[in-house]
Amino acid sequence: MQLEIKVALNFIISYLYNKLPRRRADLFGEELERLLRKKYEGHWYPEKPLKGSGFRCVHIGEVVDPVVELAAKRSGLAVEDVRANVPEELSVWIDPFEVSYQIGEKGVVKVLYLGDSEASGTPELDKEIKSSFNPDAQVFVPIGSQDSSLSSSPSPSFGQSPSPTFIPRSAQPITFTTASFAATKFGSTKMKKGGGASGGVSVGGSGAGGQQPPPQQPRMARSPTKNLLKHKSLSLSMHSLNLIPANPAPQSQLSPNAKEFVYNGGGSPSLFFDGVEGPSTSTTAPFGSGGASTCNSSSFDVSQVFGGGANSLFLEKSPFVEGLSYNLNTMQYPNQPFQPVVLAN
């Protein structure tokens, strides 16, 4: 009886898989098996298989068998859902050594299982059912039938291994090589969007690093003239222009290739201030040629560069003056009187 009930349940449940929740369909099969076994007690006649065949028939259609309604209710399914997903007017006869079905009132009765009453033989499946049988129904095993006697019985589906069980699919493990793992994001299996090898070696288009980042623009070195242009006022002091007499300066450490022009402090007594008399003593040019005592003829006149007049130094600034913001107190000659020098390469 257990084998015949299992064949009928696999056939009915095959229509519910992939249409209703799988867990609900399994519960429906378990409840229906339990109710059918209880119903067939005392009405199973192996010596007379056709006796009580109408009583053991399970019908699902316009009129649903009360056993099916109770099993659907206990499993949380609506009877309308069960009836809508099975063929119309489905009738299944569960008899000793034979299970058959009929679709429609005038349909042909086909055999699902036919056993030998004298010797237990392998089940025979209808060719049409074998080709159209839902493969998901093969793995349906009611909980109550998972005993040793049922596990040794053949399965009605395709005559394969008895009592198939649910086997979850194992996911394929993800493997990485050292190079491919280094090219992935930290904590993820996705590849980096762009990358290059360490040490400044860039990865090619076919490498594992992916796309190359855009080349960075070379950073411009900060020029000292940038700070010079910020401050447009001259920070010239009385001491730096040698207006106050000081000791003679030692030999300059400037490059001998530079052209040096020495300003004579007594050349223009009223260079910055009207009516202010400057010192009359002339300073010898340490870099003058032939040991000249004065630099009136060879020295560079600052007033000519700054506009020519005494009062035009701060009133009319030429482009040369605007870009000139040397702080002469911070030059490399802190202990020497300043000699204004213009370098030209």
UniProtKB/Swiss-Prot annotation:
Residues 194-210 have a biased composition (Gly residues). The keyword Phosphoprotein applies. Residues 144-164 have a biased composition (Low complexity). This is Protein Tob2. Residues 144-170, 188-225 are annotated as: Disordered. GO terms for molecular function: nuclear vitamin D receptor binding. It comes from the Eukaryota. Keywords: Phosphoprotein. The modification Phosphoserine is found at S255. Anti-proliferative protein inhibits cell cycle progression from the G0/G1 to S phases. It comes from Mus musculus. Belongs to the BTG family. The keyword Transmembrane does not apply. Ubiquitous. One of its GO terms (biological process) is osteoclast differentiation. Associates with CAF1. The gene is Tob2. Transmembrane segments: none annotated. One of its GO terms (cellular component) is cytosol.
